[in-house]
Amino acid sequence: MPANASPQRPTSVRSPSLPKALARAALLALLGLGAPGAAQQPQPPVTEEVPPPAQPPLPDRRVFFTTLNVVRYNPLGLESQNRLVYQKRLFDSPSVLLRDTYASAAASLKLSPAFFKLGPVVEVQPLAVLNLRAGYEYVQFFGTFGSIQSYPDAFQPYDDDLRSATNDTAYGTSGHHFFVEPMLQAKVKSIALRTKLAIEYWNVSLHDGGTRGTFYDPTLDTLVPGKGWVLANDTDLLWLGGKWTLGARLSAVWPRYDEDATAVEPLPGRKLPTNQHLRVGPLVAYAFDTRPGGLMSKPTVLLIAGWYLKHENRVNAMPYLLGGFSFSTDLLSGR
């Protein structure tokens, strides 16, 4: 063997070791680059939980217009109820009990072919289950459509036929109407229950009766004291199904007359009437669009029927009927 063969052997042994090391390093690098991205990034702690997305908060301030337009039968009536409202959120809380809380002030206008009512209304909802509304209305009767007709006391017949026969005695006048309306409400899943008590005081200039004078009011459908109190209640049991609302309403009215009115003697064989009434029946509402905001927000049609369980003039098969249409318009809304 040539003399230079021995030095070539170690060279042949050492020279391939470097390429093998480089190849091994390259292979490890390739394996590292080919690993999944999740394996390259630190994992979050096992105990960490992602919070659910929070519901968008209610507007902190809101200005809106709302209107309800109704037509009634038994008794007959037509009325447009309108309010311009400034509303302020009370609590910025995710709590179900505190989230939908607010205070508001509004200018209210009610229009009818027989009258208008104008005045301020304040409303506060400190809890989702409690609402309180109070207001004042200046009332102007036009003397049209048989309104108003007044009586010397609370014990006069006032059914539709009699009032129609005495339409010529109707006259225009004005007065004042104060009211406080506490309401309790609750909702479990799709079932809601609410009850509203109206405490009203009337002071109307009448031609008859002095302090015992009364007048017929078609909204309350009873003889209202010219200077005195009326209590009313609406209780609704509702099923809320998206755009549909189905349920039942119980309504009652209790006029409160001056104590000396009991001095009036009834006709022979008749008892002194209380002019209270009670009715119950179905309620159906459909909202064409339930999304808030916009020029015409939540346009809704409403139908109510009520059979009289108690009434001086209307305990028969013909129910009270009401059809209505409501919507609101957001004018200003800010967080």
Each language-model region and where it sits:
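Cleavable N-terminal export/targeting peptides
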Residues: M1-D60, P292-L295, R314, S328-R335
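Terminal non-domain segments
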Residues: A26-L27, A38, G228-V230, L237-W239, ...
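Outer-membrane beta-barrel initiation region
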Residues: Q40-V96, H207
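Outer-membrane pore/translocation modules
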Residues: P42-V50, R61-F65, V129-W239, D258-V280, ...
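Transmembrane beta-strand segments that form the barrel wall of outer-membrane beta-barrel proteins
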Residues: R61-R72, D100-P113, P120, L132-G135, ...
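Compact, well-ordered interaction domains used in eukaryotic information-processing assemblies
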Residues: F115, V121-L127
